[in-house]
């Protein structure tokens, strides 16, 4: 089934009005994307809190209409519905159903991280390399955005876990994923040989997503999820926290206390330029602190002092 697609730019403040107008004139679907994606101004949208729908400052809004819709009449109807909005920057084009589906799926291709780790959407066949006997494959819903491996902070943490496995530091260990989101990091650790993973997040939605992904990957028996206030007090040989720099600063003492003596920690969700203060913040507890960069994002790793 073909469609007529209207694409335009808007701000977070005007997005509800644009979307309301589009739906009123018969849009079949409306998709929101970061207008600054793949640029230095790209914004990370982390797992939302309950009842929250965080958006980017500037968005690309794409609406699909039936193929026989008249673009000029649609534009006139939109201008009549909300004449205060600027509709002049919108552009129309005809798209085939298979083109739309392919464009969506192309955003979520199988991805490899390091020597063994693969993140593969459910709708894709396993690449040949991911079928190797020692491949660590995590299957995720392609509808996931942040926490699907596509963001540099997630990729930095996945590569770190992969290297721990290569170095023999992950097998049979317990792993804490603090700020687990979709559970992608904890699941990767399990697939790489960890014995057990604990996922902690302050968002109940994230815990549901993590538990669901664990079950779909056959890891429900080894994955346990908790709200922060319910997390058992324990230490772990491996701790990973992919959250915001401000949270990493505020939680430094707590996270340090969760790492066993000689254990490893990885911190991400850190923009380039923020790593200096965090390196100093964690220095009282960790040796061999290192910062690794991927584009505009950083990862800090260290070894817990005995």
Swiss-Prot record:
GO BP, one annotated term: methylation
Family annotation (InterPro entries): Ribosomal_L11_MeTrfase_PrmA, Ribosomal_PrmA_MeTrfase, SAM-dependent_MTases_sf
Alphabetized Pfam families for the sequence: PrmA (PF06325)
Primary location group: cytoplasm
Entry's EC annotation: 2.1.1.-
Coiled-coil intervals, chain numbering: none
Keywords of the record: Cytoplasm, Methyltransferase, S-adenosyl-L-methionine, Transferase
Positions bound to S-adenosyl-L-methionine: 154, 179, 201, 242
Sample GO molecular function, one term: protein-lysine N-methyltransferase activity
SUPFAM superfamilies: S-adenosyl-L-methionine-dependent methyltransferases (SSF53335)
Subcellular location: Cytoplasm
Record family assignment: Belongs to the methyltransferase superfamily. PrmA family.
Function: Methylates ribosomal protein L11.
Protein name: Ribosomal protein L11 methyltransferase
Origin organism lineage: Bacteria, Pseudomonadati, Pseudomonadota, Gammaproteobacteria, Lysobacterales
The encoding gene: prmA
